[in-house]
Amino acid sequence: MAPLTLSVDVKSSSATSHDVSKRVMQSSQLKINKGFFASVNTQEDKPFDFFRTLFEGFIAGGTAGVVVETALYPIDTIKTRLQAARGGGKIVLKGLYSGLAGNIAGVLPASALFVGVYEPTKQKLLKTFPDHLSAVAHLTAGAIGGLAASLIRVPTEVVKQRMQTGQFTSAPSAVRMIASKEGFRGLYAGYRSFLLRDLPFDAIQFCIYEQLCLGYKKAARRELSDPENALIGAFAGALTGAVTTPLDVIKTRLMVQGSAKQYQGIVDCVQTIVREEGAPALLKGIGPRVLWIGIGGSIFFGVLESTKRTLAQRRPNTVKETKEE
């Protein structure tokens, strides 16, 4: 009886081992890519998850908005007075917190609504678009969030800027007088110019912030710290603020003109400013605006991410992800 022999196909075994190793590496890489570029839960959507994201967005957005507005209101007041001044008018530095309380009453729900709409919209779009189009998802979500928040932002902005320029002494009296003299539409003065400024601003700022965060996470292979989020937020805010300054000047002029109707619309406003004051007038207040929005972006995104993380840690049955070694 011939002895039993065991034949091993070394080439086949090596190939099989190589295939297994390759599949493991591909699986790991897929997880990393999904983590860095999607930043969303890949599990099947549930109604509760949607409403939880919505609720957490409301809380985080409202908190961040109130903190930023309170801290930077004086700079915003100076910026508004610079932009509203015609020719070489002097800027009054008194009453820099004029209208803050009334403005907070509008900023809180507006910021809550913006982030509450932005977060679930972003997550839905990131699941729809491929990874290399994540910027489109962030741009679109930012614009949609800004559109929703504009319903609250515009009346708040009108009242705030009328008070900052000394037309009224209190928010309630401002609302009553504007409504009585200009009608309900007076509270939405400059609405189109507001959208012209804020929709691009929201879309660009959040897109820059999100894309920089994703790139940093990919390079560092870890989550960002609060100071890192704040630094990226400052850069995104300052850059976006500088680019959109002409739009902000136009919006401010249309909102503070009241019933005098010095400008008949966006085009007339631009033409009048350039004709009477020169093109550089469209950049009025760019220094305070960049400073205000840069610092504001730092505070806003720092507080926003910190609040979101705190809320996520308080979720029931939260599964903590292991950090990459």
From Swiss-Prot:
<protein>
    <recommendedName>
        <fullName>S-adenosylmethionine carrier 1, chloroplastic/mitochondrial</fullName>
    </recommendedName>
</protein>
<dbReference type="GO" id="GO:0031966">
    <property type="term" value="C:mitochondrial membrane"/>
</dbReference>
<keyword id="KW-0809">Transit peptide</keyword>
<dbReference type="GO" id="GO:0000095">
    <property type="term" value="F:S-adenosyl-L-methionine transmembrane transporter activity"/>
</dbReference>
<dbReference type="GO" id="GO:0009658">
    <property type="term" value="P:chloroplast organization"/>
</dbReference>
<dbReference type="GO" id="GO:0015805">
    <property type="term" value="P:S-adenosyl-L-methionine transport"/>
</dbReference>
<keyword id="KW-0150">Chloroplast</keyword>
<keyword id="KW-0677">Repeat</keyword>
<feature type="transmembrane region" description="Helical">
    <location>
        <begin position="55"/>
        <end position="75"/>
    </location>
</feature>
<keyword id="KW-0496">Mitochondrion</keyword>
<dbReference type="GO" id="GO:0009941">
    <property type="term" value="C:chloroplast envelope"/>
</dbReference>
<dbReference type="InterPro" id="IPR002067">
    <property type="entry name" value="Mit_carrier"/>
</dbReference>
<dbReference type="GO" id="GO:0005886">
    <property type="term" value="C:plasma membrane"/>
</dbReference>
<keyword id="KW-0812">Transmembrane</keyword>
<dbReference type="InterPro" id="IPR018108">
    <property type="entry name" value="Mitochondrial_sb/sol_carrier"/>
</dbReference>
<feature type="transmembrane region" description="Helical">
    <location>
        <begin position="285"/>
        <end position="305"/>
    </location>
</feature>
<comment type="function">
    <text>Transporter involved in exchange reactions through membranes. Has a low uniporter activity. Specifically mediates the transport of S-adenosylmethionine (SAM) and its closest analogs. Probably involved in the uptake of SAM in exchange for S-adenosylhomocysteine (SAHC), which is produced from SAM in the mitochondrial matrix and plastidial stroma by methyltransferase activities.</text>
</comment>
<feature type="transmembrane region" description="Helical">
    <location>
        <begin position="132"/>
        <end position="152"/>
    </location>
</feature>
<feature type="transit peptide" description="Chloroplast and mitochondrion">
    <location>
        <begin position="1"/>
        <end position="38"/>
    </location>
</feature>
<feature type="repeat" description="Solcar 2">
    <location>
        <begin position="133"/>
        <end position="215"/>
    </location>
</feature>
<keyword id="KW-0949">S-adenosyl-L-methionine</keyword>
<dbReference type="InterPro" id="IPR023395">
    <property type="entry name" value="Mt_carrier_dom_sf"/>
</dbReference>
<keyword id="KW-1133">Transmembrane helix</keyword>
<feature type="transmembrane region" description="Helical">
    <location>
        <begin position="97"/>
        <end position="117"/>
    </location>
</feature>
<dbReference type="Pfam" id="PF00153">
    <property type="entry name" value="Mito_carr"/>
</dbReference>
<comment type="similarity">
    <text>Belongs to the mitochondrial carrier (TC 2.A.29) family.</text>
</comment>
<feature type="repeat" description="Solcar 3">
    <location>
        <begin position="228"/>
        <end position="310"/>
    </location>
</feature>
<dbReference type="GO" id="GO:0031969">
    <property type="term" value="C:chloroplast membrane"/>
</dbReference>
<dbReference type="GO" id="GO:0009536">
    <property type="term" value="C:plastid"/>
</dbReference>
<keyword id="KW-0472">Membrane</keyword>
<dbReference type="GO" id="GO:0009507">
    <property type="term" value="C:chloroplast"/>
</dbReference>
<keyword id="KW-0813">Transport</keyword>
<keyword id="KW-0934">Plastid</keyword>
<feature type="transmembrane region" description="Helical">
    <location>
        <begin position="230"/>
        <end position="250"/>
    </location>
</feature>
<feature type="repeat" description="Solcar 1">
    <location>
        <begin position="52"/>
        <end position="124"/>
    </location>
</feature>
